[in-house]
Regions:
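ATP-binding/phosphotransfer module of carbohydrate and carboxylate kinases, centering on a glycine-rich
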Residues: 1-153
Length: 153
């Protein structure tokens, strides 16, 4: 998207003040959730988000391109997550068949299609037996388990 922007193939009608392409941490995952969830014919929610970043008069083609880029990034994230889980279980050995992994976090919980994409990637990796489940307050539970393990010595 940075390349397309600098080549003026994206946001052609814009005044060139789109710093969210180059400013770190300016485009939050909540925007990705909204963009992926926008199934309207004119992608009005995508346009609304772009307006928040002072990108006005975006074309439908611009909005489709942004949605496609976000789709690719989030799909890659889901596939990377699946590969990390697979790698951990591969390292642990064959005795861990049919395990459940608890996951906490807003990306896993709220991002459209994310859970499905993680599960699909695990199946592609030959591990449909790994079940990923949402664990609300997972970080608190994880901290408690670590503290328990340390206390037991």
């Amino acid at each position: 998207s940075v390349y397309l922007y600098h080549q003026k193939q994206l946001f052609k009608e814009s005044d060139g003040k789109e710093d969210f392409f180059t400013k770190p941490l300016s485009f939050d995952s909540k925007y990705c959730s909204v963009i992926l969830g926008d199934d309207g014919s004119n992608l009005e929610e995508v346009d609304r988000i772009l307006n928040q970043f002072h990108i006005v008069n975006s074309s439908l083609e611009d909005r489709k391109t942004i949605k496609s880029i976000v789709h690719s990034i989030v799909l890659r994230s889901a596939r990377l997550m699946a590969s990390f889980v697979h790698a951990i279980y591969a390292h642990m050995g064959d005795e861990y068949k049919g395990c459940t992994v608890g996951v906490d976090g807003s990306v896993y919980k709220y991002m459209p299609h994310y859970q499905e994409w993680v599960n699909n990637a695990l199946e592609e990796l030959g591990r449909p037996d790994i079940d990923i489940g949402l664990a609300d307050d997972g970080s608190c539970i994880g901290a408690a388990l670590v503290a328990f393990g340390v206390a037991r010595g």
